[in-house]
Amino acid sequence: MKNNFYQEDELLSNELSNRGFLLTKVDNVIGWARANSLWPMTFGLACCAVEMMQAAASRYDMDRFGMLFRPSPRQSDLMIVAGTLTNKMAPALRKVYDQMAEPKWVLSMGSCANGGGYYHFSYSVVRGCDRIVPVDVYVPGCPPTAEALIYGLMQLQKKIKRTTGFKYDTRQTH
């Protein structure tokens, strides 16, 4: 009986594919749309921002991934934190993050944004932007190359596709 069910399912699948039907879940379509139309907002703080600009230029062209840089946090769904985050800049980072609409994602770019980097032991440096905002993807390097940033963005796209469509992120920060 079990084999009969699978045979009928396979016959139905073949019949539908021959006629040109597409079967999917709404959550999969929403995840695909969100992953392929990211609108990043730059939060460039140091030298990593130069590599981020290079990734957006013609040689690497982040536009082919559906990414359109937005100047306003209210129009963007991805924040790229690139560079050294100081104690004085941390409240501004949190304020900009709070202004972004749901669902929102954060990519931490470079050693300084990930954990303080070269300035880790300085009194004025936050030891990782994940102490201020929840981070989805970390891109290592000092500074990371444009290829590393694009790889991190592709990993974020995979993560977005894995999440369900109607459930928003409920992460809490201190």
UniProtKB/Swiss-Prot annotation:
Its main location: membrane. One of its GO terms (cellular component) is respiratory chain complex I. [4Fe-4S] cluster binds at C47, C48, C112, C142. Binds 1 [4Fe-4S] cluster. It is found in: Cell inner membrane. It comes from the Bacteria. Its cofactor is [4Fe-4S] cluster. Transmembrane segments: none annotated. NDH-1 shuttles electrons from NADH, via FMN and iron-sulfur (Fe-S) centers, to quinones in the respiratory chain. Couples the redox reaction to proton translocation (for every two electrons transferred, four hydrogen ions are translocated across the cytoplasmic membrane), and thus conserves the redox energy in a proton gradient. HAMAP family: NDH1_NuoB. This is NADH-quinone oxidoreductase subunit B. It comes from Rickettsia massiliae (strain Mtu5). The lineage of its organism: Bacteria, Pseudomonadati, Pseudomonadota, Alphaproteobacteria, Rickettsiales.
